[in-house]
Amino acid sequence: MFFIHKRFRMLYNMHMKIGIYGGTFDPVHMGHIFVARSVKQELGLDSVDFVVAADPPHKHSAERTPAALRFDMVCAALKRERGMRASDIEIRRGGVSYTVDTLREMKRINKKAGLYFIVGADMLEDFPKWKNPKEILELAALVAVNRRGQERDIEALADGIRAEFGGRVEIISAEGPDISSTEIRRRVQNAQTVERLVPLSAEMLLYEKRLYQPKSIEQLAERVSNVLDEYRMRHTMLTVREAVGLAQYHGLSTEKARLAALLHDCAKLGREETVRYAEKMGYALTNEERENPFLIHSRIGALLARDLYGVQDTEILNAVERHTVGCAEMTPFDEVIFLADKLEPSRDYRRIRDLRELAFRDLDRATIAVLRNTIEYTENKGMRIHPQTEITIAALEKRVKARLHGGD
C-alpha cells in the first residue's frame, strides 16, 4: 500500500505546477493574497509557495522585521487559503538570497514539477540585471503581474527578455487592491486601522508581537508586559487593535484610543497585589471589592496610568476607569475602550459577531447590549452583579430614547 501511495505521489509531482512567490512580506497583506489567487487560477497552478526572504538583494532595510516573525505572519495569513503555503527556504539558507539559488533548490525538491516564478510587472525592466537571468528562465517560467491597461508596455519588456534569454514569460493582468507593505506599516504606526487590508490572523499576530508601533508605544508596551502575563498582554494588544478601528470609524482620536487600550488592564495584578496597591493609594475598598478585586481593576488602572505611566489626559484616564462596568456619563470615547475590551478578535462567545457589527453602527446600543450580555453571563455563574452595571444601562437607554425621539 505504501508503494502505491509513494508512486502516486511521484506521478502527481510530475504533473504539478507550482508558483513561487518571493518577497519580504513585511507584512503580508491582501494584495499579496489577491495576486497569488489570480495567478493560481489563471495558470491552473496546483499550489503557490510564498517564499519569505531572509535578505533579498533588491531590498535592504535596518528596520526590517525579523524573518521568523514575517514567516509566522505569512503562515497565519495562508492558514485558510487552499493550495498556498509559506516557505522558509531562504531563511534557512541565510545571508543574501538570489532568485536563481532559490529556484535551484526548489527544482531539486520538485524535480518533475513545472515552476512559475511570480513577480510584479515593474520588476521586468531590471530582470536582465539579476544574477543568472538565463538560468532563471531555464528553471522556471517568469510570471509578471500587472494592472489592467498596462499590457502594451509590459509586453514589450517581456518580448525583450524572451529574445535575449529565451524561456517563457507570462503576463497576467489583475485589478486587485492597491496596497503596499510600506503603507500598512505607516498606518499601524499612525494608529490607523488595517482591517481588511491584512488577513485577520496575520493582523492579530502583528499586534500581538507589537510590530510597526512608534517607539513611545513600544517602550510603554514593554513596561506593561513586565506586569501582565502573556495571555493578558495578548488581550491588551488585540484591544488596541479593536480600539483603533472603532475610534477611526466613529471619528475619535485613534492615538488616544491606542494609549487607553494599552493601559486599560494595567492593574490586572492579581487579587492580593490589587488590594495592596489600592490601600497604598488610599482607596477605600468595600468588602465586596476586597472579595472581587477585578471589580476595581479599572479604577486602580486609572491611578496607575496617571502615577506610574505618566498619563495626564483626563479623557484617557476616564476611559480606563470606566471600561469594566461603565458609568452614567459615558462618552463615545469611553464606549470605544469599553467595547474594544469586550469585542477584540480573540474573544469568542455567543452573539459576538452581531455585537461587533452593532459597535460600528451605534456605540450606545452596543454598550447596552454588551452590558446585558455580561449580566446574563454573571447570573449564570452564580455571581453578584455590580450595581453600577444597571445604572449604566439605564442612563444609556435614556440617552438612546432621547436621541430617537429628538430629545423630547
What would you call each of these model-derived segments?
Residues 179-191, 353, 370-380:
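Short helix/strand-capping connector loops at secondary-structure junctions
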Residues 222-226, 235, 244, 249-371:
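Divalent metal-dependent catalytic cores for phosphoryl transfer on phosphate-bearing substrates
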Residues 2-216:
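Nucleotidyltransferase catalytic core that binds NTPs
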Residues 96-106, 110-113, 266-296, 384-386, ...:
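N-terminal leader/targeting helix
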Residues 61-69, 93-97, 230, 234, ...:
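Residues at secondary-structure transition points
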Residues 193-217, 376-408:
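Charged phosphate-binding loop/patch that engages nucleotide di/tri-phosphates or the phosphate backbone
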Residues 42, 109, 164, 227, ...:
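Alpha-helical structural context
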